[in-house]
Amino acid sequence: MARYKTAPWASPKVCAMTTPVLQILIASTRPGRVGPSVAAWIHERALAHGGFTVELIDLAEVNLPMFDEPNHPRLREYTHQHTKDWSATISRADAFIFVIPEYNYGFNAAIKNAIDYLNHEWKYKPVGFVSYGGVAAGTRAAQMLKQVVTTLKMHPLFETVSIPFVQQFLDADRRLQPNEIMETSATAMLDELVRTSGALQVLRAPAAGLTA
């Protein structure tokens, strides 16, 4: 009878379950932006979900300059401290939610710039999108950004949250008051982030973990 070796993804080092780190990125950086209000809502839902350790990251506070590294990100030969710090931040994550506006039928410059700084740090991590805007609810920006993240071997989810005419959902304190569709969509996206992050764990594991 043939004997089979243990599959590499069955290694205890790979299969050990830990709470995944979910990073929620606020893409908009302009004064008067709606992004923090939308992000605060999905942050609360992610915490209540209980499937993650959740981090909220505001690109306005990260304040990356326009991409200024002399070497290709694939080399990881970073020369600037802001790049090294950004690399360390993104390396912590197992999954992402990008909270994005739509500018002129596309995504905003700050999120593209933040993505372009790195390469390996994004690989094999799922990403969900919470988009907002006017009649199109930011969906065109989300669809365009999916083309970018797949190039970096990220896994964009089918499940998304799309918020049309976002101002109508803000109260006097600029807190987002979601409707039932938004709440249901958020739960579905968070559930899928947990499943997909777990499935991709073996690909994120270092080579040493696969051969131990």
Named regions from a protein language model:
Residues 5, 9-100, 105-113, 176-187, ...:
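N-terminal beta1-alpha1-beta2 submodule of the flavodoxin-like/Rossmannoid cofactor-binding fold
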Residues 18-24, 124-126, 164-173:
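A short small-residue
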Residues 41-49, 117, 121, 148-151:
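Alpha-helical structural signal in soluble globular domains
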Residues 55-66, 120, 152-173:
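Mobile beta-alpha loop/short-helix "lid" or hinge segments that flank ligand
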Residues 71-72, 119, 150-153, 198:
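A generic structural signal for secondary-structure junctions
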Residues 108-124:
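Rossmann-fold NAD(P) dinucleotide-binding segment
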Residues 123-167, 180-185:
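Short, glycine-/small-residue-rich phosphate/pyrophosphate-handling segment
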